[in-house]
């Protein structure tokens, strides 16, 4: 399948950036260590807010190497992982095979997937992906189209302000070296009010928002009410829309 230049809502520099380090996706001490460390928090939040994942049809948009997708499959969900990076998907498929976990990995844009699979999923997750595409609002609209009436959609991204720049870029990339330099661009960060405005233009309705915090002194992540930097938004499809 030739996916190059298929859509304007793909940043090929972003794709190349993650493909270059895809082989280390499951290295717990490598570039993706923060994703491995926050994954239990993400999984717990999603599972709790969606009232469990067992037996549900789930789509993970921007799945990368499959960290979240695999963990949801282990919870008993029927998971499809969607990404535009060929190398991360290959890593994800191999790791799932080695781990004995079943996930259907697909190289396709979320917009194209929505055109073919409208209303198919009970749960859609879009984690740490919106800040890596040219048109994040288009992704929000596609996610809303993909979920069943009454289903759940989860977004996570980074707030756009001076504190987020200091912590997510200067702190995480240059001082603590938690993620590779160039991973983030503050111009692509998204304020909660912006994300909620995009959500309000769809049949989705906001249900809950939480911040994701890193404590430098304890070297631990936790969920909390402050959404100044990283945050997760739970929405559900309004059956009346």
Curated annotation (Swiss-Prot):
SUPFAM superfamilies: S-adenosyl-L-methionine-dependent methyltransferases. It catalyses: a 3-demethylubiquinol + S-adenosyl-L-methionine = a ubiquinol + S-adenosyl-L-homocysteine + H(+); a 3-(all-trans-polyprenyl)benzene-1,2-diol + S-adenosyl-L-methionine = a 2-methoxy-6-(all-trans-polyprenyl)phenol + S-adenosyl-L-homocysteine + H(+). S-adenosyl-L-methionine binds at residues 42, 62, 83, 127. GO terms for biological process: methylation. Keywords: Methyltransferase, S-adenosyl-L-methionine, Transferase, Ubiquinone biosynthesis. Pathway: Cofactor biosynthesis; ubiquinone biosynthesis. Belongs to the methyltransferase superfamily. UbiG/COQ3 family. This is Ubiquinone biosynthesis O-methyltransferase. It comes from Pectobacterium atrosepticum (strain SCRI 1043 / ATCC BAA-672) (Erwinia carotovora subsp. atroseptica).
């Amino acid at each position: 399948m030739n996916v190059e230049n298929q859509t304007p809502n793909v940043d090929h520099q972003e794709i190349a950036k993650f493909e270059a380090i895809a082989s280390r996706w499951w290295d717990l001490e490598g570039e993706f260590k923060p994703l491995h460390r926050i994954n239990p928090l993400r999984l717990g939040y999603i599972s709790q807010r969606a009232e469990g994942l067992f037996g549900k049809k789930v789509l993970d948009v921007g799945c990368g190497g499959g960290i979240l997708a695999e963990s949801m499959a282990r919870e008993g969900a029927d998971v499809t992982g969607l990404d535009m990076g060929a190398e991360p998907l290959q890593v994800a498929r191999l790791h799932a095979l080695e781990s004995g976990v079943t996930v259907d990995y697909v190289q396709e844009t979320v917009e194209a997937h929505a055109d073919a699979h409208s209303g198919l999923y009970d749960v859609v997750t879009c984690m740490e992906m919106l800040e890596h595409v040219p048109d994040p609002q288009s992704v929000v609209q596609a996610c809303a189209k993909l979920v069943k009436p009454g289903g759940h959609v989860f977004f996570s991204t980074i707030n756009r302000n001076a504190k987020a720049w200091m912590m997510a870029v200067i702190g995480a990339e240059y001082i603590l070296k938690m993620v590779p330099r160039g991973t983030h661009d503050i111009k692509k960060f998204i304020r909660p009010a912006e994300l909620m405005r995009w959500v309000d233009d769809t049949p989705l309705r906001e249900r809950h928002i939480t911040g994701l915090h890193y404590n430098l002194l304890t070297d631990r992540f936790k969920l909390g009410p402050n959404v100044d930097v990283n945050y997760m938004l739970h929405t559900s499809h309004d059956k009346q829309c």
